[in-house]
């Protein structure tokens, strides 16, 4: 690590989620060292929120657009000098998990393949299936982060689709099969 890199790590930074994909619900912002200097700035755009994890604990959930000043125990030059025995690496880490506050609509779900059976009265083959769509809006980002995501870097609409399918489609398929057996 050169002198230029050490100097650059001492500067305050501006943190923001610039490239928000249309199907992305949660995103862990990658920073070079997670050693965010005191008085760095966090920018939250409309339709975004941010969970701040500092020293391993959720410290804040921000949902209003704006510019926020970050407070940390990492001070320019002083922290680096005090941690020279740890290769100048601070043990005070700050991570940012951005999330979409806008509603995500028209996420499709359905049975992977239809349930087939022979209709008893006319002896015709019938295929039954279920499908639909749903919308997702994150109401309690901290709860979702702690109970579902943990430190997952990215969480997409497709992940929600898989979760819904595993929890709803399988029981619905079993229900359709039970209806078929009742009618026979």
What is each residue range found by the language model?
Residues 178-184:
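Residue-level detector of conserved catalytic or cofactor/ligand-binding positions
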Residues 160-170:
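Extended, charge-rich, solvent-exposed interface segments
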Residues 141, 148, 171, 175-178:
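A short secondary-structure junction motif
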Residues 1-127, 131, 135-149, 153-160:
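Interfacial loop/beta elements and low-complexity acidic/Ser/Thr-rich segments
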Residues 168, 173, 183:
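Long C-terminal interaction/binding lobes of large macromolecular proteins
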């Amino acid at each position: 690590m050169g002198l230029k890199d050490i100097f650059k790590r001492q500067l305050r930074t501006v943190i923001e989620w610039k490239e928000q994909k249309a199907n992305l619900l949660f995103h862990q912002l990658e920073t070079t060292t997670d050693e965010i200097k005191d008085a760095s700035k966090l920018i939250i755009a409309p339709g975004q929120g941010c969970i701040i994890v500092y020293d391993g604990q959720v410290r804040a959930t921000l949902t209003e657009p704006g510019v926020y000043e970050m407070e940390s125990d990492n001070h320019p030059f002083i922290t680096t000098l005090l941690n020279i025995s740890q290769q100048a690496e601070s043990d005070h880490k700050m991570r940012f998990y951005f999330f979409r506050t806008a509603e995500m609509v028209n996420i499709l779900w359905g049975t992977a393949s239809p349930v087939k059976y022979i209709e008893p009265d006319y002896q015709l083959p019938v295929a039954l299936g279920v499908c639909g769509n749903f919308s997702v809006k994150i109401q309690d980002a901290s709860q979702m982060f702690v109970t579902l995501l943990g430190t997952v870097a990215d969480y997409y609409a497709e992940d929600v689709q898989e979760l819904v399918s595993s929890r709803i489609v399988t029981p619905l398929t079993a229900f359709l099969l039970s209806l078929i057996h009742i009618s026979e």
